[in-house]
């Protein structure tokens, strides 16, 4: 997972004698920016959207290390709360199945140290991912219909950008 600030992109483009002509916000995968650039001889400066976003980045302390220290503290606290709940569920001998074998979900699993001793399966509609294992955590990837085999199961949605679609599908498989 990578993300560049508009300020960092602007600086890289300036080194290549380019300027930001326009910026589009793209909703896909939780949001990203699509940046269009032109040679600086064709556009005098970065567009007003770029200047506005760079100002927002500065005002929100994006370039201050303390911002990331606080973020990490909050992240670790939330991870600990989440793990307490996951282990409580597992102590009840209930199955936990991950939904969606996306790369972002695997990053989540590895950061939370969740492996095949905690997550029983990962389901994915893609036959190209089925009958394989998640990297590092070694959780088997199976088809979505595995949900029909369980009376009681917890679903951990790992493809959260399409969670609404996945929830509907899971209810169809196992109402």
Model feature map: region roles:
Residues 30-74:
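Flexible, glycine-/basic-rich loop-and-beta segments that form/coincide
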Residues 138-175:
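Phosphate-bearing ligand-interacting subdomains
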Residues 107-120:
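Substrate-recognition/cap helix-loop segment adjacent to the acidic, metal-dependent catalytic center
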Residues 1-17:
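Short alpha-helix
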